[in-house]
């Protein structure tokens, strides 16, 4: 599941195909239609932290649907996206994590002024909602990921 501009997800799909993995791409609007054909869902992340990650808006809706239908969810990413929130000041973390609202006209051009429009492209997701995080060398359940985040970043800063 990815949007039209999700270049990273499209590249990951190409890599998985090169490893003979069968992939079927479904947009968010057709997810329920494909329920009986989905073995698992693979998502991307923009940032991975100890207890949450940043992903595309709509990810929490996908997770609710997947949980209700007993479909495992994986996050495919790499260690360059890890941000250790324990060793950085809040101001630096906020510069990576906080997102300014996007253009209201992306949702409704010429909307009446009385209408409040909220448009964000990213959202925070709790790591505990994911079955496995797949990094370059290994897959980690959420309860192990926090330790991995600490080790990877400490070694990068030394």
PLM features per residue range, with description:
Residues 4-158:
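Conserved phosphate- and dinucleotide-binding cores of soluble alpha/beta proteins
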